[in-house]
Every structure is written in structure tokens, then in C-alpha cells.
Amino acid sequence: MLALWILFLLGMSTLGLVLFAAFSNKKAAQYLPPSGTFAQLGTTKLHYVDQGQGPVIVMVHGLAGNLHNFTYGLASPLAKNYRVICVDRPGCGYSERPGYADSSLEAQADTLALLLDHLAIESAVFVGHSLGGAISLAMAQRHPEKVKALALIAPLTHLPDGPAPVFKPLDIASPVVRLLLGWTLAVPGTIYRMNASLKVIFGPEKAPADFALRGGGILALKPKTFITASSDLQQAKSSMPSIEEGYAGMTTPTSVLFGREDRVLSCKQNGEDMTDRIQGLQLTLVSGGHMLPVTQIEQSLQFVETVAGKATGLAS
């Protein structure tokens, strides 16, 4: 009898967690609904925001992020002179990726190539932040004819020995466990760790008060954000070695902007050391943390405009 009661209580607790996750998912969507356009690209339904006219810039966000990381402050100023396309990576934000689909970093780069084909765009400047930097590098290696230049902001370029402590809860190898946690404990855990996580991800700078809505932070309360981020973390482990092997043969003009006090990725390994790994790479170091597209908009804007101006012939 006691065993039955324990099973009953466990079942009710699990049901409560699932219902809370569903409620959180719904509220996040209500507060920050899709703001762009959808394109069916193979197995991926990609959500993107397309604004401005001129030479094309494609912006690729990082782990557990979404396109609002760029629309927060970078996209609109750039759109005065460029056509700026901010994407929700496959499975992130409002982009959809089935569980059976190839979710490697290379496959995500291929999806971006499909987006350019879908929009009849021959080539673009790619701006990649964090994990989006690694995917942009894969894009330049696999589809060099489609990449005019790379402007990488705090990019993942080197596979570390393990994930940053703030991302340890995402380090789950089993897709089944990942799914179960995503719809039970992940959202309460995210809420519990929110303030501590933001201090690391943004530190030593502070997360702006309006980041939840303007910067897309509230979408972290969607179960699929956890599920996709956990999957992406595993995919980075398997994809990065081959991406790193490709550095020596790259000819795409590549520039990197990195914060010296980045608490998520090593500035030395992912920034400073890259000058010896990719020929001609231009490195800019600033005082700051990992979320430069949000915390240092003017610096990031100047960086992207300089890279894009050289690549497209427009004055920076």
C-alpha cells in the first residue's frame, strides 16, 4: 500500500511539473510571439526576421539564444545600409527541428545555405555569436562561395575540456533523458538559477533590465529551449574537431571581437590563439564579457560595419 502511495505521489508530482512546463511554454509565447517569417527548409521550419535593403548580413545566435539577441540593438542600425537577416537557429526560438533530424553544427550551416537559396541570395556576410560563431565557421568551410566575410563575436572556435559550469545542467547525452527533463525539471531549474546564470553569461557586465522581452530571454522558459540547447552542446563536442581541422584551409576574410573578461568562453583559446590558426584573421579585444551584442552595441556595430564595409565595398 505504501508503495502505491509513493507511486501515486510521484505520478502527481510529475504531472504537476509537466503542466507547469506547458503553462510556462504558453506564457512565454504570449509575451513574445513570433516576429518574423517562416521558411520550410528540408526538415527544418526556420523562423527569421528580414529587414533593410542592400548587401546581405546574416546573424546567427549562440547556445540557448534566439534572434532577439541581435534585434535587441544591432539589427536595426545595420539595416540602414544592409539587408539584415536574423535567424532562430534550428530548434531555437520559433524555428522547429524534428527530433530525428541531423542537428550537427554542419547540418545547421547547411540549413543556412538553404535559406540563402530560398531567398535567392548569392552570398552574405555572416555574423556569428558564441556557438553561432562555430556554425558560421562551418558555413564558410562548407559553402565558401556563399560567405563574403565572417564577423564573429565571442565565438566558440575551440572545443574546451568541458562546458562552462553555467551550462553543466545542459550536458545530457541521452535524448530521452533530455526530453523528460525538458518537460519536467528544466523550467523550474532555469527559474531557480536565472539570476546566477545571468551574472556569468553577461558578467562582468550586467544583464539589462529589459533583456527578458527585448532580448528574448523569456524564451528560456520554453521546454524546447532546454532540449535544443542540450542537444547543441552534444553536437558541438562531435562537430568542433572537424571544424577546427578546417581552419588551415580557410580563405574567407575572418574577424573576431572578444571580451577579455568573458566568463563563458576562454578569450585566449577562442580569440587570441585564432590569429595563428586562420590566415589573416583580424582580432579585436575589448573590456567586457560574453554578451557583447547586447551589452556593447556601439562597439559591436562598429565591428560588424567595418567587416561588412570591406567585404561589400560599402563605407564602414
Model-derived segments and their meaning:
Residues E261-L265, M291:
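Acidic catalytic loop of the alpha/beta-hydrolase fold
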Residues K26-A28, A164, A186-G249:
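Conserved alpha/beta-hydrolase catalytic His-Asp/Glu region
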Residues G42-T43, V49-Q51, C86-V127, L131:
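Active-site loop/oxyanion-hole signature of alpha/beta-hydrolase fold enzymes
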Residues M1-I57, K80-Y82, E122, G309-S316:
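Alpha/beta-hydrolase fold catalytic core
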Residues G289-L301:
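Catalytic histidine-centered segment of alpha/beta-hydrolase-like enzymes
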Residues Q51-Y94:
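Conserved HGGG/HGGXW glycine-rich cap/lid loop of the alpha/beta-hydrolase fold
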Residues M250, V256-F258:
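Short beta-strand/loop motif that positions the catalytic acidic residue
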Residues Q141, L150-G182:
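Flexible "cap/lid" loop of the alpha/beta hydrolase fold
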